[in-house]
C-alpha cells in the first residue's frame, strides 16, 4: 500500500475512499509537524506540503516495492531522505523522527557530525535546511513486509559547505 499523494479533490467515492483520504491527510499533517517542529527549534520557516513532489515520491516508492532498500532516486533537483523500518508497524511520524533525531550529532560551530553518529546527520540537515520550502513524501509497505519512506525536498539542501540555518 502506497500513500501520501493527497489532493484536495472530493469526487464522492466510497466510504473506504473517504477513510483512505482522511488517513493520508492525517499522515501529511504528522510529517509536516515533525519537520516543522525541528525547523522551529532552529528558527527556520516551516515547510509546506507539495502534492506534486509527493507524486514523484509515491512513484519512486512504488518502484521499490520489490527491493526495499534505501537507495536514492535519480531526481537530483530534490533533496531526499529515505528510511526503511523493519516490519509494517512504522508510522510516518516515527520514520521522520529518526531523521530529526540525528540533530543531536550535528555541531553548528564546525558544521559537521560529531560523536559516534552511526548514520551521520545529513538527513537532519536536509530537514532543517533554511532555503528548503516544500516537502512531499511517499510511504509503502514493501513485498518484504518492511516499510519504506521517501521524502523529497525543494529546493534541495546539503549542497556545498554551507550551514543548514
Where are these predicted regions, by residue range?
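A solvent-exposed, acidic/Ser-Thr-rich amphipathic alpha-helical stretch
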Residues: 70-96
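Mature, structured extracellular domains of secreted fungal proteins
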Residues: 32, 38, 67-71, 81, ...
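Short clusters of hydrophobic/aromatic residues that line enzyme substrate/ligand-binding pockets
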Residues: 47, 82, 127
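Short, well-ordered surface patches within globular domains
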Residues: 16-79
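N-terminal signal peptide
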Residues: 1-17
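Disulfide-stabilized extracellular recognition modules
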Residues: 86-165
